Amino acid sequence: MHKILTGGLLALLLLLGGVLPAAALDIHIDNSQALGGSLALRYLRTDGVWVTKGWVNFGPHSKQTVTLETWEPVFYLHVEVGGGASVELPGEKHRFWVVRDVFELEGDARPARGQQADFIKVEVRGDDPRFTLRF
């Protein structure tokens, strides 16, 4: 009886593993430009808290991957290049707080030295949660 229950639970876990969303979302940055830049990201962490964090720096003519620990296929993205010029990206705009230094803000925290920036909403579809940002 114990073996049947264990086997049944294992089969159920394997079945659910195929339906549950991944706990990580990869953002691939492919910058072919002569200027480097920075990203700020807002996403729902696996513990259920929205977090806005920055800055993920990328160099000129570089490629790198950022992994977000999240169950959600939706995140928000803000991009700056060349020392702070915002990049206008197409998409649904939302305003969130950022700080010039490296930061991580939970929920709707409003930092003392912060400013609001335009983020675009990105929704990733498919079984393999990844997004590629090309410049």
Segments from the language model and where they lie:
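Intrinsically disordered, low-complexity segments enriched in small/polar residues
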Residues: P21-D47, V51-P60, T65-T67, V79-F135
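Bacterial N-terminal signal peptides that target proteins for export
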Residues: M1-L9
